[in-house]
Regions:
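Terminal leader/tail segments of proteins
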Residues: 2-110
Length: 110
């Protein structure tokens, strides 16, 4: 099973840029590399930072379906099992390490 099979093409391209640390820009999504840290932008708003030892996720000021989709695509590539979901208009982060916790912009994904 291909890891990226259920992802949008732009999300698999974004993940390749983050994983291999190269700059990428297509439509509303950009990846910028600075000192081995990949910064991911959606509509010009920072939604993630990925370093060799950390993953920081943000909502960029917009808790949209697209933001959540980009974050979940990225999390599938860079964390063992992290994910963002919404229940009753509230965002949550879930992983085997944290369980379900309220999402906050700037949190570290583990």
């Amino acid at each position: 099973l291909n890891l990226f099979s259920n992802m949008r093409k732009i999300e698999s391209q974004m993940n390749a840029a983050v994983t291999n640390r190269y700059n990428f820009s297509k439509a509303n999504t950009q990846v910028s590399i600075d000192d081995r840290v990949a910064s991911v932008y959606l509509h010009g708003n920072l939604i993630a930072r990925v370093g060799d030892n950390f993953v920081q996720i943000l909502d960029g000021g917009w808790q949209s379906v697209t933001t959540k989709s980009r974050l979940n695509a990225l999390l599938r590539a860079v964390t063992p099992d992290g994910g963002v979901f919404q229940k009753d208009f509230t965002w949550y982060y879930n992983s085997s390490k944290t369980g379900t916790v309220p999402f906050f912009s700037g949190m570290e994904a583990v």
